[in-house]
């Protein structure tokens, strides 16, 4: 019998993307409730407890409520896409390529917290350098990023696409998170193995899906003898054998005139680049992904598949 999957919040941006990725699959059975009943707590609780895996695509408080609904039912496993549990040590962090053991941790976990879109890129760049001893304690990490506006959910999509919206956004590109207290900073710090929080400057562009995350570094402040080439080698070694996260060869990066934020739109992969001048004193690390792909729904389905295969 096919395992039962319930997407709680299936009518939101992330939930709809998960349903699209699972359309036509015969190896799972999707449980569903009508959109009009999405706030029916009794019906939600029944569906949650009927599932083998519940995928929560909800705001933080609603996710916490849903977890309470299944806490006594050990037959239900949970993938949560909110920020509620991403630094909770009782939950497996759902970035399978984060280190060599992470995929197995996800596969065997009852509770999996899906990573945020920005942290997926930032951690993907930072953690390998911390693990390799290249990025020292106390380094003042800066993360700059631009996301497609779909990351803001239905409200921001309406603001960006409907010029008659009462709070329409007409800017082609804008910064936000200006007080430097973005909700993704804690998971960047914890899962990036950082001993101090990074300065994180997020922004949104006038494109629906796509993301660029940048981490600029001064080589003189890294481990002695660090070069652009040794950083690239550390990333290559960390992701050896991976298909979803790939490191672009230095020669290919050098040939680029620009990085297109929407290159991976609709894909569930991530590309990592190392830019700089050979022999120079600075490098810029770049992660390219779809904010709704590897940054959200694609990762959730990947985690589901790992859990089902265990």
Curated annotation (Swiss-Prot):
Which InterPro entries does the UniProt record give?
Answer: AGPR_AS, AGPR_type-2, NAD(P)-bd_dom_sf, NAGSA_dehydrogenase, Semialdehyde_DH_NAD-bd
Tell me one GO molecular function of this protein.
Answer: NAD binding
Where is it located? Cytoplasm
Q: Which SMART domains match?
A: Semialdhyde_dh
Cross-referenced Pfam families: Semialdhyde_dh, Semialdhyde_dhC_1
Q: What is its EC number?
A: 1.2.1.38
Catalytic activity annotation: N-acetyl-L-glutamate 5-semialdehyde + phosphate + NADP(+) = N-acetyl-L-glutamyl 5-phosphate + NADPH + H(+)
Superkingdom of this entry's organism? Bacteria
Q: Where is the active site?
A: 117
Protein keywords:
Amino-acid biosynthesis, Arginine biosynthesis, Cytoplasm, NADP, Oxidoreductase
Protein purpose: Catalyzes the NADPH-dependent reduction of N-acetyl-5-glutamyl phosphate to yield N-acetyl-L-glutamate 5-semialdehyde.
Q: What is this protein called?
A: N-acetyl-gamma-glutamyl-phosphate reductase
State the gene name recorded for this protein: argC
């Amino acid at each position: 019998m096919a395992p039962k999957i319930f997407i709680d919040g299936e009518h939101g941006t992330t939930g709809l993307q998960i349903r699209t990725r699972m359309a036509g699959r015969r190896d799972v059975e999707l449980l569903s409730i009508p959109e009009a009943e999405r706030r029916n707590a009794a019906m939600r609780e029944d569906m949650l407890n009927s599932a083998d895996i519940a995928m929560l695509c909800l705001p933080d408080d609603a996710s916490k409520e849903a977890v309470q609904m299944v806490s006594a039912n050990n037959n239900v496993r949970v993938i949560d896409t909110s920020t509620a549990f991403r630094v909770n040590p009782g939950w497996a962090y759902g970035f399978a390529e984060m280190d060599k053991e992470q995929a197995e941790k996800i596969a065997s976990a009852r509770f999996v917290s899906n990573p945020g879109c920005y942290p997926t890129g930032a951690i993907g760049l930072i953690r390998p350098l911390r693990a390799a001893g290249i990025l020292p304690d106390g380094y003042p990490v800066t993360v700059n990023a631009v996301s497609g506006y779909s990351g803001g959910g239905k409200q921001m999509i309406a603001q960006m696409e409907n010029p008659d919206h009462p709070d329409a956004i007409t800017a082609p590109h804008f910064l936000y998170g200006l007080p430097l207290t973005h909700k993704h900073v804690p998971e960047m710090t914890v899962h990036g193995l950082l001993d101090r929080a990074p300065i994180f400057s997020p922004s949104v562009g006038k494109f629906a899906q796509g993301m660029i995350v940048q981490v600029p570094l001064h080589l003189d402040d890294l481990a002695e003898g660090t070069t652009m080439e040794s950083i690239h080698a550390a990333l290559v070694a960390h992701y050896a054998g991976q298909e979803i996260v790939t490191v672009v060869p230095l020669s290919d990066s050098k040939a680029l005139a620009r990085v297109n934020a929407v290159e991976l739109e609709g894909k569930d992969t991530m590309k990592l680049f190392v830019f700089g001048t050979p022999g120079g004193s600075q490098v810029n690390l770049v992660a390219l992904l779809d904010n709704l792909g590897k940054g959200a729904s694609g990762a959730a389905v990947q985690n589901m598949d790992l859990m089902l295969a265990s």
